[in-house]
Amino acid sequence: MNAIIFDLDGTLLDTRDDILAAFGKAFEGLGIPAPPPQKLVSVIGKRLEDCFAVFLDDDEARSAEGARLFRSWYADHYRDRTRPYPGVEEALARLASRHRLAVCTMKKGIYARALVDSFGWGPLFRSVLGSEEGFPAKPDPAMLLELCRRLDVEPEGVLYVGDTSLDAEMARRAGASFAFAAYGYGSLENQPVQVVLSSPEDLSVLGST
């Protein structure tokens, strides 16, 4: 394995509370009750407009407005209660000494990089790629393939770590291996998995994968 590329939400960081709060503010702005938390958590990892479309009968205009309201509130609150999962910082420090590391997330890059830097992880990652940089949404493999290019590695030598079926499908389409963060927010839909991580502390096994 030449490189390990990570999703962010539900994989390295527990962003649940801040994301749910932003959803709550957005649905309040739309004038309708927010769906139950477990249903909101189930869409984390999708493009934001697609998240709202799930709950708004695919109404594009209202979904776009929901995404706008979400982003407006989240811009000032994305770090209120977001924290690394236990064991992540130690695992990243060890893995960075042996592998090229990067982040591939549907979170906007400006927030992803700010969060990475705020926890002192900037020097550990060769690149952090977010959703606003002209690439199609997961599971299209374009973002992952771009990171392979930046890291100067072939996809076959990459392990992608994520917590959703979209992550697994993106890795499959790119030709990369996949490690499923089962402690995160999502689930799998029969996609191939090379490693299953039951808890954040299990990230430490990736160095020997």
Locate predicted features.
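Asp-based, Mg2+/Mn2+-dependent phosphohydrolase catalytic module
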Residues: M1, G109, R113-T209
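N-terminal helical cap/lid subdomain that shapes the substrate entry/recognition surface
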Residues: N2-E89
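Conserved G/P- and acidic residue-centered "switch" motifs that form tight phosphate/ATP-binding loops
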Residues: D7, T11, T105, D163
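Hydrophobic residues in well-ordered beta-strands that form the structural core
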Residues: D14, V103-T105, F180
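Short helix-capping segments at alpha-helix termini
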Residues: E28-P33, D59-A61, R98, G120-L124, ...
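Short beta->alpha linker loops
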Residues: V43, R47, R83-G87, K107, ...
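Short, acidic loop-to-helix structural element flanking the phosphoryl-transfer center
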Residues: D76-V103, G109-A114, P141
